[in-house]
Amino acid sequence: MVSTSFRAAASFIVISAFAAAGVDAATESGRFAIEGAGLATCAAFTQAREQRSPDDKNAAAVDSYARFIGWVEGYLTGVNRYLGDTFDIAPWQSAELYGVIIGEHCEKNPNERLFEVVQKMVITLTNDRLKQPSDMVTLKLKDNKGENRGVTIYTEVVRHAQDELKKQGLYRGEVNGQWDEDTQKGVAFYQAAVGLQDTGLPDPLTLWLLFSPQKTQLDAAAAAAKAKNKK
């Protein structure tokens, strides 16, 4: 399940991102057929997301939600294939984050179709897409509770994170895409500053906040802190 702080922090970003993304209706020259789950309504997506559970008793809901997320990932793969100057449209985002982004929008727009929402999401992702192939590195750390955590990430995303951390005075090393102790500490400092668990791992929510406009970061940090205090 997605944590309350994850959900609260992401919601501020989702609202502002979709507000700026407005997608026009298809024109005669731009019409295309929508396959499968893309025609489902936001209401159906929200229902499947709310009912999903690892419990076998809710296997149907799990399958339904997985079908929606699978459609989203397939759509994004198509974007990677056909959008010019693009290798990966979503280089650090995860299925969990897709669910939060789409879910927050769908709760407020129940009659929209899934494909419309995903089109809008793609527009918000375009500026931060990975344009060229990049090596990947798997990072494994123990969090403050001694639990093992890991993430696989592009070295180009590490470089981008180092650059943003340096701009905020949280990292003084080289911006070279190489993961090291200083980079880990910089990520942890940033996470603590915005109210996230300071694992030091560049997880999707951390990167989403880090790469977002400063005002959005502050709003999201306030939401995360508020949610954290309610636990």
Range-by-range predicted roles:
Residues 9-19:
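Bacterial N-terminal signal peptides
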Residues 22-231:
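Cell-envelope/ECM-targeting effectors and their regulatory/trafficking segments
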Residues 2, 20-21:
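Terminal, positively biased "leader/anchor" segments
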Residues 1-10:
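Bacterial N-terminal signal peptides that target proteins for export
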